[in-house]
Amino acid sequence: SFNSDGTMDETLNVQRADTRNSGLFGHYNLGWDYDIDKRNTLAASVRFGVRNNHTFQDDLTTERYLNNTLTGSTLAGNENKGAFNNVDASFNYTHYYDKPQREFSFQSMFSRNTGNSMFENFLLDPVDGTTLNRFLNDNDSYNQEVTFQVDYQTPIGTTQIVEFGGKTIMRSVFSDFASYQAIGEGPYEPSAAAGFNNNLNYDQNIAAGYLAYTLALKNGYSIKAGSRFEHTVISAYTLTEDNIDIPAYSIVVPSLNVSKRLKNNNTIKASYNRC
């Protein structure tokens, strides 16, 4: 804005704070492979990860100036904590038949991410530093996925291969957050503000199957045609809404691949997929 003498008001905001942070990060991996015999193999792996962090912002002072004159100030602080871990595990089995290129495999995978995050804000009296009010938010959550897959392939003669298999995926997502308020150093009470307390429970189950056929021609061409079918069912609800209506759906995904083997072991490919 302009003053009566035509000059413009000058506003200035100044912030300063002391900050601290600490954290822990780590990953651990374990793998195992075992050949039962020349026809049967096992493989397993486990991966564990952890990520923790803790930060503070002390004496967050905000000063507002108008034309170099202090017009107001606030004093605040906050604390943030997060603890997260994840586990990924897999187990695979493969059986090789006496006939070349004929094999059966089973795969399973498990993945889970778990976390807790919390932040707390303090509003302090800028004169004596006493606590005026506090706000706390706490959130527990996890994501989980379990997968099972079976595959089988077998040759027909020396120029054809048939493949088929099935797969199921089970996903779960959960989040539960709650907010609390307190006056001064008094006890926390649940926040009555809309949208500050809720949870989400979400489950998704997918069943899929596929069939593919490969034909190798004498002129160096190879043709692979197939199709995949998926059916998905979803259920979800929250603290404020029961049985959210999410329709189940199915899709069919055809595919076609044509390749030509060239000299010097080079290959040219063309493919088509419809999503």
Each PLM stretch: what is its role?
Residues S1-C275:
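Primarily recognizes Gram-negative and organellar outer-membrane beta-barrels
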